[in-house]
């Protein structure tokens, strides 16, 4: 399984892809390692966790994106993302997350995608705005967002 955009490959995190990312010096955090362990128990969760974002031109891992679990009973999933700082402000996050959102809606299992970001994370806020996500509410530190299937793009 692999998603593809004009500039990127987006691949689910597996033991093999973790090894490749680590060889490049990419810090695969506990969310990735935990996801791979979950996949060992239940292969159905593979697409509903972490994915690496790889630049086509040189096969460099730029960051990771993904969902925080399978869709719930209300067909809602939460998306998250993080990129190496030197790849910020180049459109990679927007391009990758848009592809993942499109994929999720095409599965038929998802009606709503939510996200949260720190109030002062202006780069992340801009990504969510470019994805046409709508602000739902906020706490003292976090802003909550969503996009519904019939409203994407």
Q: Which role does the model predict for each range below?
A:
Residues 89-104, 125-130:
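Conserved acetyl-CoA-binding loop-helix of GNAT-fold acetyltransferases
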Residues 1-78, 83-86, 99-103, 107, ...:
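GNAT-family acyltransferases
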Residues 115-125:
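Conserved beta-strand-loop-alpha-helix junction that forms the acyl-donor binding cleft
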Residues 111:
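Short acidic/polar active-site loop segments enriched in Thr and Asp
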């Amino acid at each position: 399984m692999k998603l593809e955009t004009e500039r990127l490959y987006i691949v689910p995190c597996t033991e093999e892809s973790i090894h490749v990312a680590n060889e490049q010096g990419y810090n695969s955090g506990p969310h990735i390692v935990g996801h791979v362990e979950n996949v060992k128990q239940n292969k159905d969760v593979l697409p509903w966790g972490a994915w690496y974002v790889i630049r086509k031109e040189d096969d460099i891992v730029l960051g990771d994106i993904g969902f925080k679990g399978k869709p719930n009973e209300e067909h809602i999933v939460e998306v998250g993302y993080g990129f190496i700082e030197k790849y910020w402000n180049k459109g990679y996050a927007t391009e990758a997350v848009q592809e993942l959102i499109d994929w999720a809606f095409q599965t038929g299992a998802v009606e709503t995608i939510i996200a949260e970001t720190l109030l002062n994370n202006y780069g992340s806020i801009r990504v969510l705005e470019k994805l046409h996500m709508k602000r739902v509410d906020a706490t003292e530190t976090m802003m909550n967002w969503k996009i519904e299937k019939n409203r994407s793009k």
